[in-house]
Swiss-Prot record:
Name of the coding gene: rimK
Binding sites annotated in the UniProt record for Mg(2+) 1: 248, 260
GO molecular function list: ATP binding; metal ion binding; ribosomal S6-glutamic acid ligase activity
Cofactor binding, note field: Binds 2 magnesium or manganese ions per subunit.
SUPFAM superfamilies recorded: Glutathione synthetase ATP-binding domain-like
Limits of the ATP-grasp domain: 104-287
Family note: Belongs to the RimK family.
Protein's name according to its UniProt entry: Probable alpha-L-glutamate ligase
List of residues binding Mn(2+) 2: 260, 262
GO term, biological process aspect, one: translation
Species of the source: Erythrobacter litoralis (strain HTCC2594)
PANTHER family cross-referenced by the UniProt entry: RIBOSOMAL PROTEIN BS6--L-GLUTAMATE LIGASE, RIBOSOMAL PROTEIN S6 MODIFICATION PROTEIN
Keywords (A to Z) from UniProt: ATP-binding, Ligase, Magnesium, Manganese, Metal-binding, Nucleotide-binding, Protein biosynthesis
EC number(s) given by UniProt: 6.3.2.-
Binding-site positions, Mn(2+) 1: 248, 260
Length: 301
């Protein structure tokens, strides 16, 4: 099987592991720098060029699109889809997952556990939305942020209002969420492949940091999740339409609450914490499911 991966950095652990796992199973996997792909739009002949040459012959594509090039990356992925190449995660599902508000709206629609969340455009409504999520304290997030960037814990009404006004003054969109104190600076990352949780880890934030992202200096360890947490992760992946994703949850007093569904989860932390060959499971899933022209939109919204 011939697989393409849309990614800018071939040296990332996740990307090297996917190449290794594919080659170990007798497949070829080419890493294509997303920004060097050119989309050629013509009736009945959707093509993609890479470094000036037309791309052809791929059975599947793995999108590992960086947040900073989401729109361009999704345009390239759509072109692969229109050419009949099977995507590990579809463009419409990735687009959903990159919009935190849209993700929350979809998950809420299906009754999945979420932290109290509010969204408003007018900074004059700051106090109203802080109270709507039982704050302060509150967590304020950029809609487009990743890896814990653009996430602020505001512990007083005045600091929360100041942060909201500053973000809105910079004309960026934000969510305001309740602070789940009982989580104690830890969260759970459940990795879903093909509708099953294949691995889970507990992430703990660095000292004096409520964010548990590994990119922010947090640590990870193996954890046994509850049946409710497993079901929550599987349902989140299903309703977001994602074949592979990382579902980040907090343990609250009223059960698991979803913080984010990541459509391009890193493999290093979870493979090392669990000692599982997750890259291999992803490649096996592709080999079992990739068929030419088998692209259809899943999920709602």
């Amino acid at each position: 099987m011939k697989i393409a991966m849309l990614a800018r950095n071939p040296n990332l652990y996740s990307h090297k592991r996917l190449v290794e796992a594919a080659e170990k199973r007798g497949h070829s996997l080419d890493i294509l720098n997303t920004t060097r792909c050119t989309v050629n739009i013509a009736s009945h002949r959707p093509t993609i060029s890479y470094n000036g040459e037309t791309i052809k012959g791929y059975d599947a594509v793995i999108p590992r699109i960086g947040a900073s090039i989401t729109n361009y990356g999704l345009a390239v992925l759509r072109q692969f889809e229109m050419a009949g190449v099977w995507p590990l995660n579809e463009s419409v599902a990735i687009g959903r997952s990159r919009d935190k508000l849209r993700s929350m709206q979809i998950l809420a629609k299906y009754g999945l556990g979420l932290p109290l969340t509010a969204y408003a455009n007018d900074p004059k409504q700051a106090e109203e939305i802080i109270k709507a999520v039982n704050g302060p304290p509150v967590v304020i997030k950029l809609l487009e942020g990743t890896q814990g960037i653009g996430v602020v814990l505001a512990e007083t009404m005045s600091s929360a209002k100041s942060v909201i006004e500053a973000f809105r003054g910079a004309n960026v969109n934000i969510l305001v969420q309740e602070f789940i104190k009982e989580a104690g600076g830890t969260d759970i990352r459940a990795l879903v492949v093909g509708g099953k949780v294949v691995a889970a880890m507990k992430r703990t934030g660095a000292a004096d940091d409520f964010r548990s992202n590994l990119h922010r200096g947090g640590s990870a360890q193996l954890i046994k999740i509850t049946p409710e947490e497993r079901s929550t992760a599987v349902r989140a992946a299903k309703h977001m339409g994602l074949n592979v994703c990382g579902v980040d949850m907090l343990r609250s007093n009223h059960g698991p609450v979803i913080m984010e569904v990541n459509s391009s989860p890193g493999l290093e932390g979870i493979e090392k914490a669990t000692e599982k060959d997750i890259a291999g499971q992803i490649i096996d899933y592709i080999a079992a499911n990739a068929k030419a022209g088998k692209t259809k939109t899943k999920g709602q919204g």
